[in-house]
Amino acid sequence: MITKSRLLAGTALVSLLALSACSTEAADADVQSAQASTMTVEHAQGSTEVPVNPETVYTFDLGALDTMDALDIDVDGVPAANFPDSLSQYGAEEITKIGSMKEPDFEAINAGAPDLIIISGRVADSYEELSKIAPTIDLSVDNADSWNSFKENTQTIGKIFEKEDLVEEKLGALEGKVEDTKELAADAGNGLIVMTSGGEMTAYGAGSRFGIIHDVLGLEPAAEVKGEGKHGESVSFNYIADTNPDHLFVIDRDVAVGTSGEAASAVLDNELVKSTKAAQNENITMLDSASWYLVGYGLNNVDTMVNTVHDAL
């Protein structure tokens, strides 16, 4: 016969086991939740575990800033820069300034306690130091494969902030514009890209930081430019005249970085440049210098760049 005391003891044991099971399940759920709240990001300097939907985000890369702006993602800290009109709101005082385009302010960054830091080429050497403050990813674009690199970076941002569907929608629309521009480029002859700075000129070709015109949009290069990496080839007016491009695209670096210097239009105002097919057919296009030199591969900015080239052809 089962006594009352034994029955009570058994009931207590069952309750204890049930409570233990619930606690274990809750703990497992907490672990799974914690695991789901982070993800591993492969980037230019390795792989980094980053939070999903980080609350406080700092970026030195204006292309990433432009992409996050296009996706309606809040950004809390940016470098002091000469922002183009499309990103001028980030120059406001309430947005934390985390240094310059090339030099991080480590004290300000540490004080802000960011959950994620995004960098690219200009501050790539500071990756290790920044990684000590917060998870840091390097979204530098690979100029040798700029389009796919840009897409991968954009998709990475989409995954971090759970905006994958919106990213694919915007990339799809952009790819349609690229195809339309390539059709125009097929019959547009050739082109040369020149940047002016301090009265000097540098040419950029396929595979360069501005190579989207050739590599992605399909305009034939007017010359084989010998520049390496981020740096183009120093050229003269005679070079431009001898190359004789059908289209000439011009970037004024002095305007982009906010320094005084002879305007690109004045630099190119000479008889040698005027003798080119580009000048004679009014096919010299002055590019938005901040957009092309400072921002580059951002989701909205690439759309603007593609539209500019499309209209020029």
Where do the language-model regions lie?
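Bacterial Sec-exported substrate-binding components of ABC uptake systems
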Residues: 2-62, 165-192, 254-264, 287-290, ...
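Short helix-initiation/N-cap motifs at beta->coil->alpha
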Residues: 43-45, 98-105, 227-236
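A short, structured surface patch at a secondary-structure boundary
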Residues: 56-111
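Alpha-helical, coiled-coil/dimerization segments enriched in small aliphatic residues
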Residues: 83-86, 205-233, 289
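Structured C-terminal subdomain patch of bacterial secreted/periplasmic proteins
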Residues: 246-313
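Proline-aspartate-enriched helix->loop->beta-strand connector
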Residues: 113-119, 135, 240, 244-248
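Extracytoplasmic substrate-binding proteins
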Residues: 129-198, 295-313
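Ligand-binding pocket segment of bilobal, Venus flytrap-like solute-binding proteins
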Residues: 196-198, 202, 229-257
